Regions:
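Short Fe-S-cluster ligation motifs
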Residues: 135-153, 393, 429-457
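Short acidic, hydrophobic short linear motifs in intrinsically disordered regions
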Residues: 39-55
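Non-cysteine beta-strand/loop elements that form the S-adenosyl-L-methionine
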Residues: 198-216, 278-286
Length: 457
């Protein structure tokens, strides 16, 4: 399988199974529209006749021979070596957990998938005992795995920060007895951050996610406080302070959401960069199409163009010798990550689960509140192994649309929650998400290919 596209004045060709990327000329691009394996010894006469209106016949024949040579060398149309790994996609030890430390929030974001923080379950905070049981559950279910991840999530975790501190202390106390090493992450809207919280986060948290949508008018349209006022002016000083004090060996990024109201989101990325934030993630809102802020199919041409604009802006910054990292343009063309991760992505419901303040267990934070996906409870000791096994097998070869898609090894089958919520089944591709993901991948592939081309010259 191959995928080719035009972008930024270049023609790109991706060999899907090997991950090889090539910059090709117009003749090769057009010829590949007309030939595919199994190849004849010579270029078919009807193809030569068709393309000779635009290209020299000898050039067409030479180009065909080169394509066949690359095919014989397993560089183009390479065989799928990944499907065999799908047989290894069995239920795995749990190694990561999203801990819903607070089902409450001090913001009322209009697009919030979590019903403004309580996930439709009533506002509550996780107590220490529930959090402790969750840590014990993770240790018990992790098998021989040493590195465990805990994401403190909400709602807004800073509303229950004392419990966060106690649970970090408890988890650390369990590392040596169980030969484990915890890595903590916290996601915060920044409104309630104090200097003491910042110091604790920068000491204990392996990663921190800072939620902001970009320009003041964009952020404050959707990310409002309980009284309806904006949050931008309150959070910017807090985020700047946290990032300035953060150790260089620890991760962080600002994470935004764009909606129909700011389809010029490249300006929000650049605004965040100009504020001093060079680790940036901005994602499309996922919402019911009836919502006024929802992104629909009609918005895709504008969104695609905006990603192209963003890639040009980022490339300009890098050409000036400066650093910026946009998470959705990060791509590994060197056969990484591991095969199983390429096939089933984040591991929700299998290697990763979420725990609510009352001890309920779900496949991930976006499934919380969907009764049919409740996997168990920490207090009654239940856990649905059959559901865990179902998620373990929810890889790209068991998703009909994904199996034949060129992007499958990069999106890994997409978000299971979005697939269920918007396409009716975790095995069904959510087409809107897919199309946006493919465009981001094309931009990322082209940026990487052009960089390699420049390095070779």
């Amino acid at each position: 399988m191959i995928h080719k596209f035009k972008l930024g004045g270049f023609n790109a060709l991706l060999d899907v199974n090997s991950g090889g990327v090539h910059i090709i000329d117009d003749l090769t691009y057009d010829l590949l529209d007309n030939v595919e394996p199994p190849f004849e010894e010579k270029c078919p006469e009807d193809v030569v006749r068709k393309l000779s209106k635009m290209y020299d016949s000898k050039d067409i024949e030479d180009c065909y021979e080169e394509i066949v040579s690359l095919y014989n060398d397993k560089i183009l149309f390479s065989e799928d070596d990944y499907e065999k790994y799908a047989l290894s996609a069995v239920a795995s030890p749990i190694k990561a957990m999203c801990l819903h430390i607070a089902h409450d929030c001090n913001l009322r974001c209009k697009y919030c998938f979590a019903s403004t923080g309580d996930f439709g379950q009533g506002r509550m905070l996780m107590d220490y005992e529930t959090g402790k049981r969750a840590i014990d559950f993770l240790i018990e279910r992790s098998g021989d795995g040493k590195f465990l991840e805990v994401d403190f999530f909400g709602g807004e975790p800073s509303l229950n920060f004392g419990t966060v501190e106690k649970l970090v202390e408890y988890a650390r106390s369990q590392e040596e007895p169980h030969n484990k090493k915890f890595r903590f992450t916290v996601t915060t809207n920044g409104v309630h951050l104090t200097d003491e919280m910042i110091d604790f986060i920068n000491k204990e948290m392996y990663n921190v996610v800072l939620s902001i949508d970009g320009r003041k008018e964009v952020n404050d349209r959707m990310r409002v406080r309980v009284d309806g006022s904006g949050s931008y002016d309150r959070i910017i000083p807090n985020f700047k302070k946290l990032v300035e004090k953060r150790p260089k060996n620890k991760d962080w990024y600002v994470r935004g959401t764009y909606t129909k109201y700011n389809l010029d989101f490249s300006n929000d990325v650049m605004h965040l960069y100009d504020l001093g934030f060079d680790q940036i993630s901005v994602e499309p809102v996922m919402a019911d199409p009836s919502e006024p802020y929802a992104i629909t199919e009609a918005d895709l041409p504008r969104i695609f163009k905006e990603y192209e604009i963003l890639s040009e802006k980022i490339q300009k910054i890098r050409d000036e010798g400066k650093f910026i990292n946009f998470f959705h343009f990060m791509i590994d063309l060197d056969q990484g990550p591991c095969a199983i991760k390429r096939l089933r992505g984040c591991g929700s419901g299998n290697e990763y689960v979420s725990v609510t303040p009352d001890g309920d267990i779900y496949p991930c934070h976006q499934f919380v509140g969907i009764t049919e996906f409740k996997m168990g409870n920490l207090y009654d000791g239940t856990f649905n192994e059959e559901m865990k096994d179902m998620f373990a097998h929810a890889h790209v070869y068991n998703k009909p649309e994904c199996k034949k898609c060129w992007a499958k090894f990069y999106c890994s089958g997409g978000c299971n929650a979005n697939n269920y919520i918007y396409a009716g089944d975790i095995h069904n591709a959510h087409k809107l998400s897919c199309q946006i993901q493919k465009k981001r991948l094309e931009c990322a592939i082209m940026m990487k290919a052009v960089k390699m081309l420049d390095s070779a010259e």
